[in-house]
Amino acid sequence: MRQAKDVLEVMEHVLRLKRFNRSGWCYYGVFSPESIADHSFSVSFLAMLLVEFFKDRGYEVDEARVMKMAVLHEIGESRLGDLQLDARRLLGMEHISRVERRAVSEILEAFPELSKLWNEFEDGETVEALIVKIADKLELLLQALDYEKRGARNLDKIFGDSENRKNFSKLPFIEEFVEGICKSRGEK
């Protein structure tokens, strides 16, 4: 049986996410960038909207699993910090994945069912995991668009990097969102 200390220990990690800025925005010179917790909230909200979007189109989606995955998706960064994409590539994506899996397993040791959900997200093989992975990347593009509207420059690489559009082709209709974002940027 879990104890109060188990909950409190996990919450120590969650609270760290409020203090860590998303490193990619710092790398690109964005003034006052969002925290990892800010990002996680936006991803969770977008994932909730995407669940409704896909349900409207006849998909069966387990909303609770999507929401839990969305809330959990960055928990490993409470131990590792947020690694900017170029740093991830330099260190090796597979290596980062192994280390992050270990960190999440340790953080959620008293909550193995949540650790299992995080691993499902990381594997990206279920509709629920894909919705969260896509929400994660769409949120990145939306945040970049918001920063551009507020005067940030030099964010073109974020929009053009294929890693930031990973998994988009695995679910239908996602290009509609990308087209809407590009249109808002003034792209054709």
Task: Label every model-predicted segment.
Residues 1-188:
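Alpha-helical, largely C-terminal catalytic domains
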